[in-house]
Amino acid sequence: MNHEQPDIESQQSAADAAATAGVNDEVERLRAEIEQVKADALRERADLENQRKRVARDIEQARKFANEKLLGDLLPVFDSLDAGLKAAGDDPHPLREGLELTYKQLLKVAADNGLVLLDPIGQPFNPEHHQAISQVPTPGAAPGSVVTVFQKGYLLNERLLRPALVVVAAD
């Protein structure tokens, strides 16, 4: 009977070792699963944050350019007021002064909403902001510089709304 005792103990030890190994394997599997869940949660949090930033940026862009159509529709009005002031000359007349004040107020309101006037006389030609309609030899002007502006251009929050129509000094 003594001989059977060590067999039972060795079987019990083997069973305990197998059970311990099984538990250790299960613990490792659960740890790996926890790490995977943590990584997935972190990825989801990052995706959510990126989406929040994207939506905020889209809202900001929509706010920035909400006035684009209105201000674009006002450009011919600016042109007409400017032409009227040039036609009136420099004579001090109440109608001319009223027209000039109206034009300045309108330009200020537009500027407060992100509109920037492009009046590039003397500046180098910039194809991103200017549309050349001709080149003329101009003594005293740097080649490639704007010498005449036929129609002023405008930027809205640094984005071109209308290019300036210009004449450029020939090389």
Curated annotation (Swiss-Prot):
Q: Does the keyword Cytoplasm apply?
A: yes
Origin: domain of life: Bacteria
> Region entry Disordered: which residue ranges?
1-22
Its main subcellular localisation, reduced to a broad class, is cytoplasm
Q: Which PROSITE patterns match?
A: GRPE
Gene3D superfamilies membership: 3.90.20.20, Head domain of nucleotide exchange factor GrpE
Its localization reads: Cytoplasm
Which InterPro entries does the UniProt entry name for this protein? GrpE, GrpE_coiled_coil, GrpE_head
User: From the UniProt record, which GO molecular function terms apply?
Assistant: adenyl-nucleotide exchange factor activity; protein homodimerization activity; protein-folding chaperone binding; unfolded protein binding
Cite a GO CC annotation: cytosol
- Alphabetical keyword list: Chaperone, Cytoplasm, Stress response
GO terms for biological process, alphabetical: protein folding
> Can you state the subunit structure given in the record?
Homodimer.
Read off the PANTHER family from this record. GRPE PROTEIN, GRPE PROTEIN HOMOLOG, MITOCHONDRIAL
The record's similarity note reads: Belongs to the GrpE family.
**Matching NCBIfam families:** PRK14147.1
Outline what the protein does.
Participates actively in the response to hyperosmotic and heat shock by preventing the aggregation of stress-denatured proteins, in association with DnaK and GrpE. It is the nucleotide exchange factor for DnaK and may function as a thermosensor. Unfolded proteins bind initially to DnaJ; upon interaction with the DnaJ-bound protein, DnaK hydrolyzes its bound ATP, resulting in the formation of a stable complex. GrpE releases ADP from DnaK; ATP binding to DnaK triggers the release of the substrate protein, thus completing the reaction cycle.
Task: Write down what this protein is called.
Answer: Protein GrpE
- What species was this sequence derived from? Stenotrophomonas maltophilia (strain K279a)
Q: Which gene encodes it?
A: grpE
